[in-house]
Structures are given as C-alpha cells and as structure tokens.
Amino acid sequence: PNPPSVQNHSRLVVYRRLVFNNFCSFLNSCFPITRSILSAQEWQQLSQTAFSGIRAHSPLFRNIPDIFLQWLQKQPQPYLPQYPWLLEFMHYEWLELVVETHAAQLDKINHLMPQVEDPLNSYPLPNPTLQLACYRWPVHTLQTGHIPTQALPDAHCFAVVRQRND
C-alpha cells in the first residue's frame, strides 16, 4: 500500500483536532469547577491523556463524561495525586449532570401511587432523578479558593435530585 499523502495526513490532523475539541466541550460542561480548580495545563494534559487512552464503545456524545470518569477511576495510580479529592469531586459534578439531564418529566409524575384518593393505601414514589452517593471528601463545599486538605472522619452521603421547578 502507498503511504498516506501529506494532504491526507493534514486532513487527519484537522479531524483529530475537531473530535478532540468536541470531546473537551463535553468534559468542560460536565466538570466546570474541576476545570477552574486545576491549572489550564493540568486540565489540558488530563483531557489529552484521556482522549488518547479511552476506547469508548458508545457512539453517544452525552456519554463522554461518564466514560471519561470510568477511565479515570480505573487508572492504576491517581492521575493527579496532589488532588486526593479529585475523583470524588468529579463524580459529584458528574452526578449533578446526570440528575439535571435525566429524561423524567417531573411535572407529569404523580408522586403518590397507586390510589391517591385513598391515603391509607397510597405510598410515595421516589423522584426518578434521585441519585445517592457517599464521599469521604467534603465535595459539597469544594470550589476555587476552598480546597480541602484532608478527608472527613466519616463519609457524607447525599441524595441528589431535580425538583419540578429546576
């Protein structure tokens, strides 16, 4: 076979850059606080390493943050060991996106089933967007300028939900 032409190589470089930029746009929208805490160089390096290392099996772009997070969790060593809270915090940010983008139409859900007219035979239904998680780091307070230095003595558990008016 003939070696790829310079023109084909240039096209591949442009295509790779377009796909990488698209990949990064999904990461940037899912992990905005992580991105603001890490240096631009750290975030860029993490994004590039993940882009090169991930072998995604889903064609859906909306799955990119989940696939990225799974990849990061499977790394044999913490990717950025100077941020021991990073994985938990990124999971928390991702969980917020999962809840926000859940397909449930909350305004159409009756939260008492099956017989609303008989309160003694009714029971509450959980919000379908409900996600539960426990973390050792105070992920709910983490932000630029407020970085924890040690894990909490006990895990904090969260119920993340979307309300009807969200």
Give the location of each predicted region.
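Charged, compositionally biased N-terminal leader segments and the immediate start
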Residues: 1-13
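Alpha-helical structural motif
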Residues: 11, 19, 23, 30, ...
